[in-house]
UniProtKB/Swiss-Prot annotation:
The gene is kdpB. The lineage of its organism: Bacteria, Bacillati, Bacillota, Bacilli, Bacillales. GO terms for cellular component: plasma membrane; potassium ion-transporting ATPase complex; potassium:proton antiporter complex. Its EC number is 7.2.2.6. ATP binds at residues 361, 365, 393-400, 412. It is found in: Cell membrane. Belongs to the cation transport ATPase (P-type) (TC 3.A.3) family. Type IA subfamily. The chain crosses the membrane at residues 55-75, 79-99, 245-265, 271-291, 605-625, 633-653, 677-697. It is a multi-pass membrane protein. Keywords: ATP-binding, Cell membrane, Ion transport, Magnesium, Membrane, Metal-binding, Nucleotide-binding, Phosphoprotein, Potassium, Potassium transport, Translocase, Transmembrane, Transmembrane helix, Transport. It comes from Bacillus cereus (strain ATCC 14579 / DSM 31 / CCUG 7414 / JCM 2152 / NBRC 15305 / NCIMB 9373 / NCTC 2599 / NRRL B-3711). The system is composed of three essential subunits: KdpA, KdpB and KdpC. This is Potassium-transporting ATPase ATP-binding subunit. Mg(2+) binds at residues 535, 539. One of its GO terms (biological process) is potassium ion transmembrane transport. HAMAP family: KdpB.
């Protein structure tokens, strides 16, 4: 009996292993394809119309053209051999190619993601319901906003829409990567559906909310391909500074021959070009675009869709995060924790009526009450409740329960609402009701009062558990100087307890959607950048007001349109990771800029003595690296300048190691590693290259 089971299990494991091996092979093939495409693109990007978008590398390309032409002309200097110009031109060519490769590689990863998304955009037909009730099959490309479509089991949802009738399980793995289907139903905050996803059970009727080319997948494809990518304000500012430096050094180099002629010697044009390339910040100039593209790519890999690079950068500068309590800080499933009788009632009586009020209640809270009562072996008449008329919870009444056939009315609900209901029927309120309700609230729980007609029997203690690790995560944010504010509809006592347990800095109790906007504006008035999460239509104004608004993919269309980021996994806690990615992007750009500028110090000590030693022997004192010869020094500096770009591509793509710490500590750390390192590494690198070059010249 056991042997077939063992064989079957072994075969299953082998198939799983083969599946994993296939995935690995496909990933390697994709990586090879991306690299091959990037190599081709690095050559295509040599087009001056493309290169001029990056002024720094455009100057290097002009230098390549000049030295390449000079290599075919007679040398004006007897000290410069004929092969020198062509060697310099080749090094400059590879410098530009390496920079182009970095950008093309970053773009290639986005295009690979776009290709996989395009697979979900197949030729789909939709069953459109006409005004007269007839159902007509049309192509998805012919659908327009406002069309009503029926989607059955096994059919693909043709375009973005909202469910107006029915309930169904929808497979969203084409977008989210999550294989587990999600429930979509009419009404509420989970009615939004996305084109390209598939209905795996039941049937729904949807109203189309986007025209062709405007769907969610269309936007994703456009964004990850980079077609909609615009340079961020910080990127533009840095690019302006780097371009200004390049212009200053260009003026210096162009005017240098005037002074050298005055001193009685001439500098070869190729040497001047080499000096210019070594002076300008080519390292960061070659990696700047790749850093920005890779930053958005990292967000996308986290299953978060950023509508612009500006949103990712803003996440890195966030000062305050507004967080909902339910589902973000806590699990959101309030479960029955204990029963508290009041007056002279017993726990058995409370349990009996609590269970009867919950038999027809399909909410998680109602189910948890039944489970708790059964776990305590408290008896109750289930049939009695099933024969009664269920009274659902309403926002106006804040109660639910059941009206039994004999006229008995059983209710459970918010303390104030049930007390008011009992008093309206002439009942009296036990003295310890409010006392025990306050106790539950102070413990961080939610009190529900159980009453029958005009008599209160006791309270149900519902407890919502704080997610593990939240206190540590908020402490990390605090170390980064980020304030956390919890917004909750709970009463102040419950809110204060949860806030203390979770470790948030501030909380807003009994919070309404409009209160969130007030909190955001108050923080922004202090000059702070604010991030928040949301999924409902009522969250849309606050998401639009926030500097970083992260909407849940499971939420409404209004919320997703108002936000500048969308979490495909619908996990509100991911806002913390998004902030980390934003900070990593800014840190990577800053660190590599520091490294690039620090590099110039070593290049000065390599190339300047080489240029002036023959005319000014005293300049030999600056040759602290003891380089072999002037020509070797110039070539070594140029080679290092070129090689450092591809060596830093992995760092630009992956981002520098990120640890939560204060801004001052972060600045000191980066200056030590990338500032001091940017000075030391070129000294070592240029010297090693000089030794190798010295063997050939």
């Amino acid at each position: 009996m056991m042997r077939p089971v063992v064989v079957k299990e072994k075969q299953l494991n082998e198939s799983q292993i083969h599946a994993v091996e296939d995935e690995v092979r496909q990933a390697k093939t994709m990586d090879r394809d991306i690299v091959t495409h990037a190599m081709k693109q690095s050559v295509a990007k040599l087009n001056p119309k493309v290169m001029i978008k990056n002024p720094i590398m455009f100057v290097v390309e002009i230098g390549f053209i000049i030295t390449f032409i000079l290599s075919f002309l007679p040398s004006s200097s007897s000290s410069i051999p004929g092969w020198f110009n062509i060697t310099v031109s080749l090094i400059l060519l590879f410098t530009v190619l390496f920079a182009n490769f970095a950008e093309a590689l970053a773009e290639g990863r986005g295009k690979a993601q776009a290709d996989s998304l395009k697979q979900s955009k197949k030729d789909v037909f939709a069953n459109v319901v006409k005004e007269n009730g007839d159902i007509v099959q049309v192509s998805a490309t012919d659908l327009r906003k406002g069309d009503v479509v029926i989607v059955k089991q096994g059919e693909m949802i043709p375009s973005d829409g909202e469910v107006i009738k029915g309930l169904a399980s929808v497979d969203e793995s084409a977008i989210t990567g999550e294989s587990a289907p999600v429930i979509k139903e009419a009404g509420g905050d989970f009615c939004s559906v996305t084109g390209g996803t598939m209905v795996v059970s039941d049937e729904i009727t949807i109203v189309i909310t986007s025209n062709p080319g405007e769907s969610f997948i269309d936007k994703m494809i456009s964004l990850v391909e980079g077609a909609a990518r615009q340079k961020t304000p910080n990127e533009i500012a840095l690019n302006t500074v780097l371009t200004s430096l390049t212009l200053i050094f260009l003026i210096v180099v162009v005017t240098l021959p005037i002074f050298t002629n005055y001193l009685g010697f001439q500098i070869d044009t190729a040497v001047l070009v080499a000096l210019l390339v070594c002076l300008i910040p080519t390292t960061i100039g070659g990696l700047l675009s790749a850093i920005g593209i890779a930053g958005m790519d990292r967000v996308t890999k986290f299953n978060v869709l950023a509508m612009s690079g500006k949103a990712v950068e803003a996440a890195g500068d966030i000062n305050t995060i507004i967080l909902d309590k339910t589902g973000t800080i806590t699990f959101g499933n309030r479960m029955a924790h204990t029963l508290l009788p009041v007056g002279n009632e017993t726990i058995e009586q409370v349990g009996k009526w609590a269970a009867i009020s919950s038999v027809l209640d399909e909410t998680p809270e109602g189910r948890s009450v039944i489970e708790y009562v059964q776990g305590k072996s408290i008896s109750y008449n289930r049939e009695l409740a099933e024969q009664g008329e269920f009274v659902p919870f309403k926002a106006e009444t804040r109660m639910s329960g059941v009206d039994l056939q004999d006229g008995t009315k059983v209710r459970k609900g918010a303390v104030g609402s049930v007390i008011e209901w009992v008093q309206s029927q002439g009942g009296t309120i036990p003295k310890d009701v409010n006392q025990k309700a306050d106790f539950i609230s102070k413990e961080g729980g939610t009190p529900l009062v159980v009453a029958v007609n005009n008599r209160i029997y006791g309270l149900i203690y519902l407890k919502d558990t704080v997610k593990p690790g939240m206190r540590e995560r908020f402490e990390q944010l605090r170390q980064m100087g980020i304030k956390t504010v919890m917004c909750t509809g709970d009463n102040p006592l419950t809110a204060a307890t949860i806030a203390k347990e979770a470790g948030v800095d501030e909380f807003v109790a009994e919070c309404k959607p409009e209160d969130k906007i007030a909190v955001i504006k108050a923080e922004q008035d202090k000059g702070k950048l604010v991030a928040m999460t949301g999924d409902g239509t009522n969250d849309a104004p606050a998401l639009a007001q926030a500097d970083v608004g992260l909407a849940m993919n499971s939420g409404t269309t209004a919320a997703k349109e108002a936000a500048n980021m969308i979490d495909l996994d619908s996990n509100p806690t991911k806002i913390i990771e998004v902030v980390g990615i934003g900070k990593q992007l800014l840190m990577t750009r800053g660190a590599l800029t520091t490294f690039s500028i620090a590099n110039d110090i070593a290049k000065y000590f390599a190339i300047i003595p080489a240029m002036f030693t023959l005319a000014i022997p005293q300049m030999e004192a600056l040759n602290i690296m003891k380089l072999t010869s002037p020509l070797s020094a110039i070539l070594s500096a140029l080679i290092f300048n070129a090689v450092i770009i591809p060596l830093l591509i992995p760092l630009a793509m992956k981002g520098i190691a990120y640890k939560p710490m204060s801004s001052n500590a972060l600045l000191s750390r980066n200056l030590l590693i990338y500032g001091l390192g940017g000075v030391i590494v070129p000294f070592i690198g240029i010297k090693v290259i000089d030794i190798i070059v010295g063997l050939f010249i």
